[in-house]
Amino acid sequence: MFKKFLSALLVSSLWLSGAAMAQTKQIKVGVIFDMSGPLAAGGSNASYLGTKYAIDLINERGGVEGHRIVPIYVDAQSKTEVAINETERLLNQEKVDVIMGVFSSAQCVPMAQRVDQAKKFMWANVCVSSAVFKDKNLRNVFRAQVHSDQMGEASCRFLGENSKAKLGKEVKDLKVAIIYEDGPYGAGVASGNDLVCKQLGMQVVLKEGYAATSPDLSPLVTKLRRARPDVILHTGYNPDITLFLRQAKEQGLKWDALIGHGAGHGQFDKLFATFKDDANLIMNVDPVAAQLLDPKTLRPGMGALTAEMIKRYKAEVKADEIPTHVSMGFNQTWILLSDVM
């Protein structure tokens, strides 16, 4: 029923100019990601590439019911104001039928409202903030992605299940610090952390937000040294994650476990290049990368699709590690173009 509703809504949006669409046999899609600026290396560029591969494959297979997808790729430059302005341009000047993509939740929240007000269709591939939808009553914006409070819950439940066996401490004795970039993404995950860790009986000894653009996180490191947590739950982008880890090591901050929640924490190749073996001590909560799933448990043909995605990424990027953001971009786009449209 949900798929039928989505399909009906999308059809009504796409076919407002039915005669012209039928003649051109095209669907114009505006794709917004950060290909430059700090968010690019934090997962946005990988998300863009995954999205691009899915669109290319759909077109190579004949498009969506014979309609070729015509993507207009836009670089938001890691700036919210650029993402908003480009959304307006794509809707009003390029006359796109669909807006999709979006890595940053700080961009996603205002973009979703603009697209919904314009009564156009938006499909969010990567941004996770629960604030995109919470209490908004959006009618034309959709996301198959996990929500930020769910990510925050997941890390706490993981700790609750493994505290005794892996850390040698009862849950009630576990001291947790929650640190996060103070935008919609970080605040959303931290809210889930705070709620669920306390529900499970853990001691939250510090909860502190910071600006993702901060040039110095040493005051935060000092607070953590005073709080002496067993576990640090960190939600950040890039390069704030790198800055924090570097300054934490310089100041001798110790922990039993550090758990990240996506973005820069999911870019393992970059973490290993910067921190070498220290990166082995970092865990991450994220949707599972497609290549880590057993293809026999998936719908027929999905294993071959995943292999093609990996092949194209390795050929373009010349990398051995495939970040989960490639799968996010690819999978969410494939769902839209093959199952919804």
Regions found by a protein language model. Name each.
Residues 27-52, 74-81, 103-104, 179-188, ...:
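Extracytoplasmic "Venus flytrap"
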Residues 24, 48-71, 163-171, 198-202:
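Signal peptide-proximal N-terminal region
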Residues 42-47, 56, 61-135, 144, ...:
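Beta-alpha junction/loop-to-helix N-cap segments that form part of ligand/metal-binding clefts
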Residues 16-22:
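Sec/Tat signal peptide C-region and signal peptidase I cleavage site
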Residues 249-330:
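Extracellular/periplasmic periplasmic-binding protein-like sensory domains
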Residues 49, 96-207, 258-284:
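Extracytoplasmic ligand/sensor domains, especially the bilobed periplasmic-binding protein
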Residues 332-341:
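Extracellular/periplasmic bilobal clamshell ligand-binding domains
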